[in-house]
Amino acid sequence: MKQVIQIRCKNNKKSQKVEIGSTLFDIFSAFDLKMTHGPVSARVNNKVEGMHYRVYNSKDVEFLDMTSSSGSRAYTRTLFFVLCKAVQDIYPATDVVIDIPVSNGFYVDIRLGRPVVDEDVNIIRRRMQEIIDARMPIRRFTVPTEEAVALFQEKGDVEKVKLLKTSGSIYTTYYKIGDYVDYYYGTLLTNTSQLYLFGLEKYYDGMLLRIPSLKNPDVLGEMTRQDKMFEIFKEHHRWQSILGIRTVGDFNQAIDANHSTDIINISEALQEKKIAKIAEEIASRKGVKLVLLAGPSSSGKTTSCKRLSIQLAVNGLKPLQISLDDYFVDREKTLKDASGEYDYESIYALDLDLINEQFNALFRGEEVELPKYDFQSGKSKKSGNKLKMNDNNVLVVEGIHALNPELTAHIPQEQIFRVYASALTTILLDNHNYIPTTDNRLLRRIIRDYKYRGVSAQETIHRWPSVRAGENKWIFPFQENADAMLNTAMLYELAVIKTQAEPLLQQVPENCEEYAEAYRLLKFLKYFKGIPYNNLPPTSLLREFLGGSSFHY
């Protein structure tokens, strides 16, 4: 007699008995579910698993499609796998680096020893399509880590060997397409035929791998030029070469060699050098009266503003700092979003008329009294703080909407210098596994919300999708308007954040949806060796989130 287990399916709120050891694909078929763009993965007791996964105990299961972040990641990782196999098939001795998310896709550095040309891209694209059309199964293997290390040593994959040796894991999962072997952090699809849409184009010195849009998986994400953003990534690559650290394996080896203090000091010095350079550029522009500093949530705007103000003072200017948070309209005047919640992410939550009126008055040499927004009462009040600008004063204004043209529509543009700050992670797990640029911002916010606002990690994770939606609508479209960009991510920061975030993530209960993201982040942080945060200087931007800063917030 066959043994059976009980599965509760969240998609249709039905229960059904299935044979013990059934794969998630078997279970999906048993429930006779229909998904246009899936399933690509599933939450099993709120842990994301691939459709290869076999179930041996009664579980709650929710199947995910391409409109979910977890599903989109599984699809994207599988595209990486097929791309790397295609390159190996055509150029066997060539290294491939899945580098950075840019232009709604991923920049791919292919090291041919010569410039990449259009024909290279066309050949690789055709080979990828052949692999997809061949409907090749993607097989999953779990072995002792030392066995996986030996496998990748034999392949000559130095970066994976370094990562796995320092991961601390007893067992490691790897995947195969045909005879091609690779390791990926996270779930993959089960067959190459599930990759129904992709794009591959020449982009700068490499290639751009394009993926389906999260909002509409029937089309590729819109390709947009992000020249300034791309330059910031390249700048950080140069910084990494100074430190000799490109991947987490490199980083962990440096920590084991007791180089953590050097890494911190050099990283902080490089960031301060960049801030000083921006200040010099501002000072060299005659007539600039307003410095606008924008960036997404937890990008470190406040500390960046304070450090930039210090460097402006070094250049002979007298900065006056203003936060756009004090220009919110009264709560009852705030527009609501589709869910009926007050939409504080919208630029129309700010009193745009008052901003333009007061800034122009200041530029004319008049005295103004700044407002102060009371977040508890939801009311704008007079602050008693009066400002008047002299010839060598400059306003330094920070806020998420600072680069939106509507904010300063009535201010002469020659008086404005725009700075965009964001935490763009450039360290890689290894050459085929990138780190999402949003992960360190989410982790920063989890720590800050708990430490300063009494908000749990579960609640911060719950709110994060709406924060991201607001950024996509109100912040990212204007980032290329910046005169200068500042990457606030520190090479070492995830090693420090690990020590503060892990206890908070461990408090997220298993029976809530947010557990899936908490579990993913905990699994991800395990790759990093920890660094105590008391090693950071008091002016470090990270102290805005971790505490112990010499700045007053």
Map each language-model feature to its residues:
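Conserved lysine of the Walker
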Residues: 301
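Short beta-strand-centered segment that lines the nucleotide-binding/catalytic pocket of NTP-utilizing
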Residues: 314-332
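Conserved NTP phosphate-binding and transfer environment spanning the P-loop NTPase/kinase superfamily
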Residues: 286, 409-553
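Hydrophobic anchor at the beta1->P-loop junction of P-loop NTPases
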Residues: 291-293
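Conserved nucleotide-sensing/catalytic segment adjacent to the nucleotide-binding pocket
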Residues: 320, 333-376
